[in-house]
Design a protein with these regions (language model features):
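Metallo-beta-lactamase
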Residues: 1-55, 59-62
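C-terminal regulatory/interaction regions
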Residues: 69-106
Length: 106
């Protein structure tokens, strides 16, 4: 999936392998150099070209690094909030971080 302007929902990708596959799919999409990508989940006006793909890809990379650096969801949440201040849908970040750190089953 592709997102824009909101925290990316990662609760359904609970393994590094599934998130890597997601990244690979985004790479394939970007390689087609689309004029516009309409994200499945977004707020505001999506950017032209691959902007939404690039945003999602960057977010996933940062999420992966935060997971590697922190054992608990609070650390992941705080890291992503600092990296994306004011980004909407913090509840998606919070639930996704809890699921991906094993604090919550999904």
């Amino acid at each position: 999936g592709v997102a824009w302007g909101i925290h990316v929902w990662t609760a359904d990708t609970q393994t590094p392998e599934s998130r890597k596959q997601w990244q690979e799919t985004l790479e394939h999409m970007a390689a087609h150099k689309p004029e516009r990508v309409i994200p499945g989940h977004y707020l505001g006006t999506p950017p032209a070209g691959t902007g939404a793909i690039d945003f999602t890809r960057d977010y996933l990379q940062r999420f992966e690094k935060a997971l590697a650096a922190h054992k608990d969801s609070a650390g992941v949440i705080n890291t992503l909030k600092k990296q994306y201040p004011g980004l909407a849908d913090e509840s998606s970040l919070e639930l996704s971080a809890k699921v991906n750190t094993g604090e919550m089953k999904w």
